């Protein structure tokens, strides 16, 4: 019996953890209706659009495709195994799966010598490179809600892409943190923080780019700015620095995916600010990102290998190349000769257009994008919809369980990868 079915057969709302955003909200529920799944208890646009990708409960189970033609699952597995066995340098991309799927992917990557890079890998590596170079103080959503009295959003307001974020931080509740947006002068005015909240939002504007603003704020916090700059943009940043020092618990929130190229430098400046503040008060950073399984795959690969993504299990050992092993660069340079793409949470991110042999494990809606010769498509279940699973939340230290809403009749990514691994062993024999 699924989470939405009662013993009487009536379909009712059930508690649900939303897998469509790295916040992994678990405070609302889902109803199964004749035409699909309906969100209850929230107006989150990301959750609604994610649920809209799934049709009626009675939808037929789609067939796998080989060269665009329907086939049985075993034929698709055999074709995918032949592609990977013939490849001298495969690329595993997308990586939109849960913990079990990532654990099954790692031994396959080791066997084939694959390079692994998730969708949005550049954003993920911004934070990882800063962490590797200088370390970081980070926090959790619960800590922000219970302790933070000043939240500074860097560059943009997260609620535009994470609609539930400010509610998760307790914004609008009595005695909670103030929100400050650090934003360039050229940016458009921000929308209200939370519907029905009159507190509004404080904005500190600066001229120039975010690199300059982050560096200047770090200098102000460290007390390295003289009086001669007090009347310009540094004056506003100096006032913000004073507020950061006066706060009991300040949190700097940023979205790696919204940072420009070389955004690692901005994150390093933010980490310096947090480190300086922690000498006399409490402060932390909170990066928002790693959705579509990216942070989960990175966590799994790190604990299994000791190295993050953009790593290859080569004959000489593990190679971690955060710049050279960028999926887009590898495809553009034709440095790889086969692509395995995993996208189990929806039709985005779609596999990149390429004439290389492709194996796609994905949401059934991706079938139309995987046609033609040299392609294999295997539809898989979505964790949190058709199967149970686990994902790491954006704050990195919280592993959230996902409960299936219904049985969609599809295999999980972990099951498909396990069968593919066995087929490869048979090919080698």
Predicted features, each with a name:
Residues 1-220, 256, 422-429:
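N-terminal export/assembly segments and adjacent metallocofactor-ligating motifs
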Residues 46-49, 103-113, 310-320, 330-338:
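Short low-complexity stretches enriched in small and charged residues
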Residues 10-27, 259-260, 288-306:
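N-terminal, charge-rich interaction modules
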Residues 14, 59-63, 307, 378, ...:
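Intrinsic-disorder/low-complexity coil detector
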Residues 128-281, 313-429:
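Non-catalytic alpha/beta scaffold blocks inside enzyme catalytic domains
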Residues 113-134, 282-309:
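Short connector loops at secondary-structure junctions
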């Amino acid at each position: 019996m699924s989470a939405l079915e009662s013993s009487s057969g009536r379909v009712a709302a059930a508690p649900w953890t939303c897998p469509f955003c790295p916040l992994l909200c678990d405070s609302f529920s889902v109803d199964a209706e004749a035409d699909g799944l309906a969100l209850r208890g929230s107006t989150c646009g990301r959750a609604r659009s994610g649920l809209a990708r799934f049709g009626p409960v009675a939808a037929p189970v789609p067939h796998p495709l080989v060269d665009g033609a329907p086939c049985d699952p075993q034929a698709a597995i055999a074709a995918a195994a032949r592609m990977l066995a013939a490849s001298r340098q495969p690329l595993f991309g997308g990586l939109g799966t849960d913990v079990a799927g990532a654990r099954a992917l790692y031994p396959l990557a080791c066997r084939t010598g694959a390079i692994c890079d998730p969708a949005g890998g550049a954003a993920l590596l911004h934070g990882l490179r800063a962490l590797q170079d200088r370390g970081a103080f980070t926090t959790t959503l619960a800590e922000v809600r219970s302790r933070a009295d000043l939240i500074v959003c860097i560059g943009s307001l997260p609620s535009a892409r994470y609609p539930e974020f400010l509610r998760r931080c307790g914004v609008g509740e009595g005695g909670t943190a103030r929100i400050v947006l650090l934003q360039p002068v050229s940016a458009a005015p921000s929308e209200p923080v939370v519907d029905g909240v009159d507190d509004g939002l404080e904005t500190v504007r600066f001229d120039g780019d975010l690199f300059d603003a982050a560096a200047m704020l770090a200098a102000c916090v460290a007390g390295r700015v003289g009086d001669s700059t007090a009347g310009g943009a540094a004056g506003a940043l100096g006032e913000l620095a004073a507020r950061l020092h006066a706060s009991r618990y300040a949190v700097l929130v940023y979205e790696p995916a919204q940072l420009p190229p070389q955004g690692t430098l901005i994150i390093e400046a933010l980490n310096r600010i947090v480190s300086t503040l922690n000498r006399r008060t409490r402060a932390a950073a909170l990066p928002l990102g790693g959705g579509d399984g990216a942070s989960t795959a990175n966590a799994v690969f790190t604990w299994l290998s000791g190295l993050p993504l953009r790593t290859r299990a080569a004959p000489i050992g593990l190679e971690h190349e955060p710049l050279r092993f960028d999926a887009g660069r590898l495809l553009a340079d034709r440095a790889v000769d086969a692509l395995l793409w995993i996208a189990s949470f929806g039709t985005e991110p779609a596999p990149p257009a390429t004439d290389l042999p492709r194996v796609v494990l994905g949401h059934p809606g991706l079938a139309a994008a995987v046609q033609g010769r040299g392609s294999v498509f295997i539809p898989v279940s979505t964790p949190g919809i058709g199967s149970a699973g686990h994902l790491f939340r954006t704050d990195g230290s919280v592993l959230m369980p996902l409960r299936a809403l219904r049985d969609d009749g599809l295999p999980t990514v972990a099951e498909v990868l396990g069968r593919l691994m066995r087929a490869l062993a048979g090919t080698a024999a």
